UniProtKB/Swiss-Prot annotation:
Gene3D superfamilies: 3.40.50.1100. Keywords: Amino-acid biosynthesis, Aromatic amino acid biosynthesis, Lyase, Pyridoxal phosphate, Tryptophan biosynthesis. Pathway: Amino-acid biosynthesis; L-tryptophan biosynthesis; L-tryptophan from chorismate: step 5/5. Tetramer of two alpha and two beta chains. It catalyses: (1S,2R)-1-C-(indol-3-yl)glycerol 3-phosphate + L-serine = D-glyceraldehyde 3-phosphate + L-tryptophan + H2O. It holds the Pfam family PALP. This is Tryptophan synthase beta chain. The modification N6-(pyridoxal phosphate)lysine is found at residue 86. The keyword Lipoprotein does not apply. One of its GO terms (molecular function) is tryptophan synthase activity. GO terms for cellular component: cytoplasm. The beta subunit is responsible for the synthesis of L-tryptophan from indole and L-serine.
Length: 396
């Protein structure tokens, strides 16, 4: 049986075919031993510093906040090699794969960011890489598709279902169930069956650890709130982990509201879904009346996921974190505002978190508040999507 608790309150677990249990237990053993192995930790830390570029900056937004008493900082995961926070944990998982003697990596990707991160880690560490990607996402994210192929990854289009991230996840798990003796499944978010939610959190927690040290140095106190977008939830749990035991710091997760919650076209299962079992875990998810997984929707491919990581579900259920939603339109406005005010092009995913921070600022301009937004990735991959939308609106 497991050595670590596979549940967060009532959420989580290992709802997988029996054939995959040995692979998950082997992964848990490797993770536990690696966490207490100074050589593993030294190699991981060295890669994060000298290859990925950690620590990332904490940047104050002076222009965006003019006319208000809000002090707003961005944790700059967009500056990380690979363009997003995804690079952190794939380096950790790739080292674990080598520790277990695996020769191949299987991964799924939505926006393509986890695919790019997986491809670069495999190129660096000499692992074969095959990546499942929904056909619809391939259309939305052609630059990332080419990046993956440039770095030697095989990208397999998935045409089944909605041809998006959830379908790519299903295909990747199916592949792994037949190849786990030689392959490691490099799950891209803090979701799925145990031990993945725990592993991914621990391999992302430096985001919050660095933020805490940097904000104390720059402001002399902890923030009033840390804000992060939530799809599966890895960048958010990486930011939240070191602040969970700081009761004075509000944790705010921002789900994609899509065309508006009432439209049904969104990706906000935490607040507007029902608990079920999917992708190896028990967690809130978007379901039809008869319990089928419903298609999620977001302008940002990386948030277009019908469920959410189990630790977020737990933090929501006990009231420790507050989860809100932001529409496509609001995210787009925040995207444009950051470009024009600060000269930073954010990912559309991260723009959801920024939009909520700007909303907090606008609603209380006289309130002295210290906010940190996790800018989880850069927006290079999204410029064509945004270009098409702004062209259609006649804005450019």
């Amino acid at each position: 049986m497991t050595r670590l608790n596979p549940y967060f309150g009532e959420f989580g677990g290992m709802y997988v075919p029996q054939i995959l249990m040995p692979a998950l237990l082997q992964l848990e053993d490797a993770f536990i031993s690696a966490q207490s192995d100074p050589a593993f930790q030294a190699e991981f830390t060295d890669l994060l510093k000298n290859y990925a570029g950690r620590p990332t900056a904490l940047t104050r937004c002076l222009n965006l906040t003019k006319g208000s008493k809000t002090r707003l900082y961005l944790k700059r995961e967009d500056l990380l090699h690979g363009g997003a926070h995804k690079t952190n944990q794939v380096l950790g998982q790739a080292l674990l794969a080598k520790r277990m003697g695996k020769k191949e990596i299987i991964a799924e990707t939505g926006a393509g960011q986890h695919g790019v991160a997986s491809a670069l880690a495999c190129a660096l560490l000499g692992l074969k890489c095959r990546i499942y990607m929904g056909a619809k996402d391939i259309e939305r994210q052609s630059p990332n598709l080419f990046r993956m192929r440039l770095m030697g990854a095989e990208v397999i289009p998935v045409h089944s279902g909605s041809a998006t991230l959830k379908d790519a996840c299903n295909e990747a798990l199916r592949d792994w169930s037949g190849s786990y003796e030689t392959a490691h499944y490099m799950l891209g978010t803090a979701a799925g069956p145990h031990p993945f939610p725990t592993i991914v959190r621990e391999f992302q927690r430096m985001i919050g650890e660095e933020t805490k040290a940097q904000i104390l140095q720059q402001e002399g106190r902890l923030p009033d709130a840390v804000i992060a977008c939530v799809g599966g939830g890895s960048n958010a749990i990486g930011m939240f982990a070191d602040f969970i035991d700081e009761p004075g710091v509000e944790l705010i997760g921002v789900e994609p509201g899509g065309h508006g919650i009432e439209s049904g076209e969104h990706g906000a299962p935490l607040k507007h879904g029902r608990v079920g079992i999917y992708f190896g875990m028990k967690s809130p998810m978007m379901q039809t009346a008869d319990g089928q997984i419903e298609e999620s929707y977001s302008i940002s491919a990386g948030l277009d996921f019908p469920s959410v990581g189990p630790q977020h579900a737990h933090l929501n259920s006990i009231g420790r974190a507050n989860y809100v939603s932001i529409t496509d339109e609001e995210a787009l406005d925040a995207f444009k505002a950051l470009c024009r005010s600060e000269g930073i092009i954010p990912a559309l995913e991260s723009s959801h978190a920024l939009a909520h921070a700007l909303k907090m600022m606008r609603e209380a301009p006289e309130k002295e508040q210290l906010l940190v937004v996790n800018l989880s990735g850069r927006g290079d991959k999204d410029i064509f999507t945004v270009h098409d939308i702004l062209t259609a609106k006649g804005e450019i």
